[in-house]
């Protein structure tokens, strides 16, 4: 083993285990992962325990832990920006694939919405601050500071390959990642309990309630509780921050993915030509497309918004209206999922005629994208298979059951074919990677050294070639760079497919993220599995399905740019 650590004197490039720093690389990663796992498990224990009345863990305990974690993470970020990143040769390389502009732009957008949510949350708890714990008012303020500091940090440092304070940086990145995941889980649990509370209010189920004030958690009656949100402004603040939870959830997940890529890049050595092949050129939206994909995608987006609003209005009304709302909701989703499946399949077929080379270079960002796409899809797979079993085994053969079954089957097919299309697209080289064949019938294609008068006499050449004269003293000899770039039909089709799938994934993210829960409005699964089991399945799996949609949007935007 010791002989393997000694580099041969004639070797120009040492192996990965030659340097003692590289030997400790895995140990430093293991230490940071263990730190993140333990912190995250502690946070998950408190968050899950605070969601139920029968567990003696209060929401103030959860807020105190999250506030402490955000303060520590913000302090480390400040140390990184002021000390670590300013060391000599601290960042010798920058990963061109990490932190693309659309990912950082999405992070800023979701961060702004999170700041608005923190303002609403502060106003909500300040409406009855006399009987509230100070930590409830302090928590959204600290979260706003943390969001600002972290967003600035990721905007300027997402591409860093840091080579200073390696172990401290790894631990700091993993701790910050664990903090974001804890915030994500707290938001998901709070939103899920809020949805369960709405369901129990109309069906008499009391196994779940919202995170209540401490006096009520301690056993006080609701009528005697002075900490009630009774004013109009308090109701606005309460409803406002619940509707902004989806943006907070996506912000935490976006930040977590960028932090993981930074963690993978700590101490990474890059070649001087890294990223040159995949640097996207300046593009404009809808350029070099057939417009069919954007138009059809926008049409489905607008129709989906109308269906979502109609569903939310009717599902809270009479029972007959709920059934009608479910039929409309499932019908739209079946049409949308069916079109997305066919379009994804056609994109994979188009790649069979694509001559671009496959990109097999090491790329932590792409590896993470593929893993997240495959992993997040498992949540929707689980819900779909549970629905299929409930419909086939236990439900009567009616229209609602048929729509539910078709929706579940198409959901599985759509996720599968879309993942295949996106993953294959991410592994394709840029358009310039196509092998260029120079047929003998077109001698003027490419770069030709020739006499200018002879070039003008060729009938098959373009009328206005671009000439570059390397030496003014010999004007008769020149370099004629005659480029005839044309956008192939398959490239246009791929751009249309990417935009269509992007818009469809946005509307399919909006519906469940902002409260559409046909899983509970449709009583097939609730009657078959029971409310407690079905609620656990949906509340665990649905957040991954929601994250899948937004992550697919990010990946499809990259596919569009690189097409």
UniProtKB/Swiss-Prot annotation:
Domain of life: Eukaryota
Gene Ontology biological-process entries: proton transmembrane transport
UniProt KW Lyase keyword: no
Catalytic reaction equation(s): H(+)(in) = H(+)(out)
Cell compartments where the protein resides: Cell membrane
One Gene Ontology molecular-function label: proton channel activity
Bilayer disposition of the protein: Multi-pass membrane protein
Stated regulation of activity: Actives at neutral and alkaline extracellular pH, acid extracellular pH appears to inhibit the channel. Insensitive to activation by Zn(2+).
Tissue: Expressed at higher level in stomach, testis and olfactory bulb.
Function comment: Proton-selective ion channel open at neutral pH. Actives at neutral and alkaline extracellular pH, likely participates in some alkali-related physiological activities.
Name of the protein in question: Proton channel OTOP2
Primary gene name: Otop2
């Amino acid at each position: 083993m010791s002989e393997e650590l000694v580099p041969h004197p004639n070797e120009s490039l040492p192996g990965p285990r030659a340097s003692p720093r590289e030997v400790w690389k895995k140990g430093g990663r293991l230490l940071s992962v263990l730190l993140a796992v333990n912190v995250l498990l502690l946070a998950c224990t408190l968050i899950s325990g605070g969601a139920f009345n029968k567990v003696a863990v209060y929401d103030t305990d959860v807020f105190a832990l999250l506030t402490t974690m955000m303060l520590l993470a913000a302090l480390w970020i400040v140390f990184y920006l002021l000390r670590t990143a300013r060391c000599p040769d601290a960042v010798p390389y920058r990963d061109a694939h990490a932190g693309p502009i659309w990912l950082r732009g999405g992070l800023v957008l979701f961060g702004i919405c999170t700041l608005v949510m923190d303002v609403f949350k502060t106003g909500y708890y300040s409406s009855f601050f006399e009987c509230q714990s100070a930590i409830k008012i302090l928590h959204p303020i600290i979260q706003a500071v943390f969001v600002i500091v972290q967003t600035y940090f990721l905007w300027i440092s997402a591409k860093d390959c840091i080579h200073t304070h390696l172990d401290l940086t790894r631990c700091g990145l993993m701790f910050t990642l664990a903090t974001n995941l804890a915030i994500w889980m707290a938001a998901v649990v709070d939103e899920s309990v809020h949805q369960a509370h709405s369901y129990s209010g109309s069906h008499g189920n009391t196994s779940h309630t919202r995170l209540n004030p401490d006096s009520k958690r301690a056993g006080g009656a609701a009528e005697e509780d002075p900490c009630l949100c009774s004013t109009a402004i308090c109701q606005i603040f309460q409803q406002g921050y619940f509707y902004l939870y989806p943006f907070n959830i996506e912000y935490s997940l976006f930040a977590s993915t960028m932090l993981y890529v930074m963690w993978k890049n700590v101490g990474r050595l890059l070649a001087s030509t890294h990223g040159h092949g995949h640097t996207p050129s300046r593009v404009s939206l809808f350029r070099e497309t057939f417009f069919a994909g954007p138009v059809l995608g926008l049409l489905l987006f607008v129709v989906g918004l109308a269906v979502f609003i109609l569903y939310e209005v009717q599902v809270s009304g009479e029972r007959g209206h709920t059934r009608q709302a479910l039929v409309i909701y499932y019908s739209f989703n079946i049409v949308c999922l069916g079109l997305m499946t066919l379009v994804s399949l056609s994109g994979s077929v188009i790649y069979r005629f694509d001559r671009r080379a496959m990109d097999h270079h090491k790329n932590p960002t792409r590896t993470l994208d593929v893993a997240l796409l495959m992993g997040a899809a498992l949540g929707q797979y689980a819900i779909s298979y549970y629905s299929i079993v409930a419909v086939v085994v236990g439900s009567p053969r009616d229209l609602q059951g048929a729509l539910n079954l078709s929706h579940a089957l198409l959901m599985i097919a759509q996720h599968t074919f879309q993942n295949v299309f996106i993953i294959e697209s991410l592994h394709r080289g840029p358009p310039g990677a196509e092998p260029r064949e120079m047929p003998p019938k077109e001698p003027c294609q490419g770069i030709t050294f020739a006499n200018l008068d002879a070039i003008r006499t060729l009938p098959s050449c373009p009328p206005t070639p671009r000439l570059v004269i390397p030496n003014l003293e010999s004007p008769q000899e020149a370099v004629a760079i005659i480029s005839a770039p044309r956008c192939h039909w398959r490239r246009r089709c791929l751009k249309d497919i990417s935009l269509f799938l992007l818009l469809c994934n946005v509307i399919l993210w909006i519906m469940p993220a902002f409260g559409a829960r046909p899983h509970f409005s449709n009583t097939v699964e609730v009657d078959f599995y029971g409310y407690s089991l079905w609620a656990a399945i949906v509340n665990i799996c649905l957040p991954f399905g929601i994250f899948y949609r937004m992550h697919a949007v990010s990946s499809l935007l990259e596919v569009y740019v690189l097409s």
